[in-house]
Amino acid sequence: MIYLKNKEDVIRMEGTIVEALPNAMFRVQLDNGFKVLAHVSGKMRKNFIRLVPGDRVVVELTIYDLTRGRIVYRKKLDSKGEEEILDDDE
């Protein structure tokens, strides 16, 4: 799923963390099959959001460099280990 932000030249995409790297960097495989190098956003760092390989995340990519991104959200899993589906209406 691709989201476009209006205020910046940013593309949001969903993916899965494949590998944890030093300095809070992660290799993320996007839903379209591409792998990108992503770092954790400042708010996630500040709130001590832990990321491990296998987590579903939302990554922001700039239109200028599609090989690097910023992880802005970790998807929540329900009790069965499946991704919760959130309605846009709520």
Swiss-Prot record:
Residues 7-76 form the S1-like domain. Pfam families: eIF-1a (PF01176). GO terms for molecular function: ribosome binding; rRNA binding; translation initiation factor activity. Keywords: Cytoplasm, Initiation factor, Protein biosynthesis, RNA-binding, rRNA-binding. InterPro entries: NA-bd_OB-fold, RNA-binding_domain_S1_IF1, S1_domain, TIF_IF1. It is found in: Cytoplasm. The keyword RNA-binding applies. Its main location: cytoplasm. It comes from the Bacteria. GO terms for cellular component: cytosol. Component of the 30S ribosomal translation pre-initiation complex which assembles on the 30S ribosome in the order IF-2 and IF-3, IF-1 and N-formylmethionyl-tRNA(fMet); mRNA recruitment can occur at any time during PIC assembly. One of the essential components for the initiation of protein synthesis. Stabilizes the binding of IF-2 and IF-3 on the 30S subunit to which N-formylmethionyl-tRNA(fMet) subsequently binds. Helps modulate mRNA selection, yielding the 30S pre-initiation complex (PIC). Upon addition of the 50S ribosomal subunit IF-1, IF-2 and IF-3 are released leaving the mature 70S translation initiation complex. PANTHER family: TRANSLATION INITIATION FACTOR IF-1, CHLOROPLASTIC. Belongs to the IF-1 family. This is Translation initiation factor IF-1. It comes from Fervidobacterium nodosum (strain ATCC 35602 / DSM 5306 / Rt17-B1). The gene is infA.
